[in-house]
């Protein structure tokens, strides 16, 4: 189907969650390309991960997908429809963003999960149970009505993450963006976080940025970025067999790198 410019911003539903980048090249300053000819397809319900050193382009891919920046070269499609045709509302509501350091605001635990949306108490509770946040919330003096201080400073980083997971699930997104969601977690909460993430990803298309390769070994596809280009792709096992950049990164993290 051909889409005309006057249809921009009119599509207000993400049906399946297929994602495609076609020949996307992007520069923040118009001089230096931070992404060069990026091509990939993610089928509905799949998890793909992007790995690479700082500045390799991982975050830029997410920035473009979330429409934080406009790109001039190439196409980004959701369900074979150019991303410009989707309304900002549907992109905001149906793409769940899980950040490294989730933002909690002054209010109650429930209002932080609800996030200004018309979500019933029962749904707030169901979302919390789904991500295993219910247990610690129930133990708070006022439970879901417990006050949250600015930035949620009274909670551990793991608890903040679980509240953010509940917030994401309550909105029932079609697509998840995970930005190193386990970077700042105390080890005892790590297992709960990993289990919850797996449940959240189930049936949803997921784009994950990872620094720790141990967290993305089960991804359907891993893309290795270097200086704005995808230099390797495959499953964890396939990439190890290639003995390329991913293999080196994995060896380094596993602490087996020989001097």
Regions found by a protein language model. Give the residues of each.
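ABC-type nucleotide-binding domain
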Residues: 3-259
């Amino acid at each position: 189907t051909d889409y005309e410019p006057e249809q921009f911003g009119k599509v207000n539903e993400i049906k399946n969650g297929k994602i495609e980048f076609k020949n996307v090249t992007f520069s923040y300053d118009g001089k230096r390309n931070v992404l060069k000819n990026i091509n990939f397809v993610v089928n509905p319900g799949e998890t793909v991960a992007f790995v690479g050193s700082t500045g390799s382009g991982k975050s830029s891919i997410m920035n473009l997908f979330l429409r934080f920046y406009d790109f001039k070269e190439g196409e980004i499609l959701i369900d074979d429809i150019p991303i410009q045709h989707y309304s900002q509302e549907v992109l905001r509501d149906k793409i769940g963003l899980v950040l490294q350091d989730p933002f909690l605001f002054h209010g109650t635990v429930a209002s932080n999960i609800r996030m200004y949306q018309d979500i019933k108490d029962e749904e707030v509770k169901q979302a919390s149970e789904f991500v295993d946040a219910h247990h610690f919330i129930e133990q708070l003096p006022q439970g879901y009505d417990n006050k949250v201080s600015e930035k949620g400073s009274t909670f551990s980083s793991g608890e903040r993450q679980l509240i953010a997971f509940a917030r994401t699930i309550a909105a029932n997104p079609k697509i998840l963006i995970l930005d190193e969601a386990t970077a700042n977690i105390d080890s005892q909460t790590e297992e709960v976080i990993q289990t919850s993430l797996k449940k959240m990803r189930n049936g949803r298309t997921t784009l994950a940025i990872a620094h720790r390769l141990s967290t993305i070994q089960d991804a359907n596809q891993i893309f290795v970025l270097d200086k704005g280009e995808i230099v390797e792709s495959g499953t964890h096992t396939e990439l190890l067999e290639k003995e390329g950049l991913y293999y080196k990164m994995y060896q380094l993290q596993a602490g087996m790198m020989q001097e």
